[in-house]
Amino acid sequence: MNLQRLSVFGTDNIGVYIYTNNKYTIIPRGLDSETKENIAQVLGTELLEAEISRSFLLGIFISGNDNGILLPKSTIDDEFRFLKENLRDCRVEILNSKVTALGNTILANNKAALIYPEFNDIEEKIIKETLGVEDIKRGKIAQMITVGSVGVITNKGGLVHVDTSEKELKELEKLFGVKIDIGTVNFGSVFIKSGLVANDKGTLVGASTTGPEILRIQKALGE
């Protein structure tokens, strides 16, 4: 597995700004060419420069997998059209929900999704259909309802909040169909998503992520 440390706009919270699946990586405009080349090389995807809700916080607003991409209702028409036209083999839908931080509230791979407990039945149905997952479940991770913020799951493995119990880990492994471990990023942060961007081909970690954290991440994501 390719793994590289990265900073974006002077911060190690790279997952706030970047969304990836195995086909596309959506990045904010304004990154230098070297950073863009590194991202594309490590993740092995096509890069798209975009905004959501006139913001560069793409990792916060976007959730998805290889089948589909979900955008918040605050997405502006031209932003939606751009992604719809360029994400050619992904379904792209707007989730009409009061919840807009979809990256923080939906945790998914190609098999399953764990979602924010307060999504309603209609929202759950749209999420399931758009992502094309077999299983979907509302729940928490380590008592955190923002499940997307405290985990990263690929089709090869996953890393979640360090306080996740053994029972929870087993339930998550059954749901997603992969081995999952606990850990931290960026020198002790439990908000895994903020410091980790990964797909089945590669991994980017925040620049302050330590050697021991990286070893744990590599093991968890199936290297």
From Swiss-Prot:
Superkingdom assignment: Archaea
Functional note: Binds to the 50S ribosomal subunit and prevents its association with the 30S ribosomal subunit to form the 70S initiation complex. Inhibits translation of both leadered and leaderless mRNAs, maybe by binding to the 50S ribosome subunit, preventing it from binding to the 30S subunit.
Induction conditions: Constitutively expressed, further induced by cold (60) or heat (90 degrees Celsius) shock (at protein level).
PTM comment: Modified in an unknown fashion (not phosphorylation) following release from 50S ribosomal subunits.
The keyword Cell membrane is assigned to this record: no
Subunit and interaction comment: Associates with the 50S ribosomal subunit, specifically with protein L14. Binds to 23S rRNA, possibly between where the 30S and 50S subunits associate to initiate translation.
Keyword Nucleotide-binding set for record: no
Family: Belongs to the eIF-6 family.
Gene Ontology terms for molecular function: ribosome binding; rRNA binding; translation initiation factor activity
The protein's name in its UniProt record: Translation initiation factor 6
Record keywords, A-Z: Initiation factor, Protein biosynthesis, RNA-binding, rRNA-binding, Stress response
GO CC field: cytosol
GO BP, one annotated term: maturation of LSU-rRNA
InterPro entries: eIF6 (IPR002769)
Pfam families, sorted: eIF-6 (PF01912)
